């Protein structure tokens, strides 16, 4: 159980964009119509687009976005958000490049692979989450004979998809604890996070690497037991999720982007300091497929931290660790996804 995991309250001043947005929204809320200048962002011109198609991972990694959506922060900026849960990162990224989505929120590993391997024109516009203790871990069942990471040798460790961030985090922690990755079996096919606990309980996999809220749900429903926290060593406080647009979309929608970021930054700040806000936002989503979390899970699930802006040095950790574990053929400079 994660009843002992407490949300970490951080005292931090509002970022300049968020502060400006809050002040402007207080004086101008409710005055914007379609095509109007964003009331909260102080945009210098009309919004190029007021209805955005946004695909985001339905997990606690996206809490800042869900808070902004729940609290009407995008609406205050003159934006209507059409939200789609991003179940498969590869599918969503390909659809985004094809124009189906304006902005997506997903794991950095998948985005970097698409840029490094397929030269997709993707730009990181904001950070979404950093891993915190308890927010991702490896689990077994209560009667499992596996009691340590070393005992995973020869066993099947369930991950969301081959070569994605779920694999990378597990690989980093296993290696740090002296486990040869060649001695651990991984599924050849993806296992959706909502199905992973059931696979574990049915004995189809011997252990499972799961993020929140799926981890706490597995504990509540099946009695799953934490074997190892993934927040350690090379993966400690690891950047997990970011928000991305194509380079052409960023260039063609500067005012819309500014409005989106103003709302998102407010959501990030609230999520980072108010556990109650995160619980309420995720409890009221339309269904489990969209990220809805029942109150019994929301009350005890561990949360990430939710940074503001983009930190190049911090994000460079992701491709560096990817290269170390063979997910990139050569070193990758994250600056090419930041416009620098």
What is each of the regions a protein language model found here?
Residues 1-49:
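Short, low-complexity disordered leader/linker segments with a strong preference
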Residues 35-183, 188-190, 206-212, 227, ...:
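Short, glycine-/small- and polar/acidic-enriched structural segments
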Residues 59, 86-90, 105, 164-165, ...:
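Soluble non-cytosolic domains of exported or imported proteins
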Residues 109, 118, 186-187, 192-283:
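Pocket-lining segment of extracytoplasmic ligand-binding domains
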Residues 154, 220, 339:
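Phosphate-coordinating loops and pocket residues in cytosolic domains that bind phosphorylated ligands
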Residues 250-327:
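Secondary-structure end/capping motifs
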């Amino acid at each position: 159980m994660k009843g002992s995991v407490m949300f970490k309250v951080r005292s931090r001043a509002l970022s300049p964009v968020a502060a400006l947005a809050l002040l402007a929204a207080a004086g101008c809320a409710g005055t914007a119509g379609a095509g109007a200048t964003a009331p909260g962002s102080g945009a210098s011109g009309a919004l190029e687009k007021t209805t955005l198609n946004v695909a985001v991972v339905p997990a606690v990694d996206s809490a800042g976005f869900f808070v902004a959506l729940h609290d009407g922060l995008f609406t205050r900026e003159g934006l209507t958000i059409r939200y789609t849960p991003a179940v498969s990162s590869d599918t969503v990224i390909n659809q985004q490049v094809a124009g189906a989505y304006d902005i997506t929120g997903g794991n950095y590993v998948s985005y970097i692979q698409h840029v490094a391997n397929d030269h997709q024109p993707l730009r990181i516009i904001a950070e979404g989450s950093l891993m915190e203790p308890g927010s991702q871990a490896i689990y077994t069942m209560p009667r499992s004979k596996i009691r340590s990471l070393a005992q995973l040798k020869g066993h099947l460790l369930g991950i969301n998809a081959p070569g994605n961030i779920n694999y990378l985090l597990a690989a980093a922690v296993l290696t740090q604890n002296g486990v040869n990755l060649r001695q651990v079996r991984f599924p050849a096919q993806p296992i959706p996070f909502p199905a992973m606990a059931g696979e574990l309980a049915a004995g189809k996999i011997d252990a499972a690497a799961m993020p929140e809220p799926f981890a706490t749900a597995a504990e509540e429903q099946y009695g799953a037991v934490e074997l190892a926290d993934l927040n350690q060593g090379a993966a400690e406080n690891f950047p997990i999720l970011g928000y991305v647009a194509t380079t052409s979309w960023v260039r063609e929608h500067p005012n819309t982007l500014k409005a989106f970021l103003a709302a998102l930054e407010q959501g990030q700040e609230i999520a980072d300091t108010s556990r109650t806000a995160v619980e309420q936002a995720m409890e009221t989503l339309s269904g489990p497929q969209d990220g809805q979390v029942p109150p019994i899970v929301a009350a005890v699930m561990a949360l990430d931290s939710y940074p503001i802006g983009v930190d190049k040095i911090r994000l460079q950790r992701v491709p560096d660790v990817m290269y170390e574990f063979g997910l990139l053929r050569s070193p990758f400079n994250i600056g090419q996804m930041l416009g620098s």
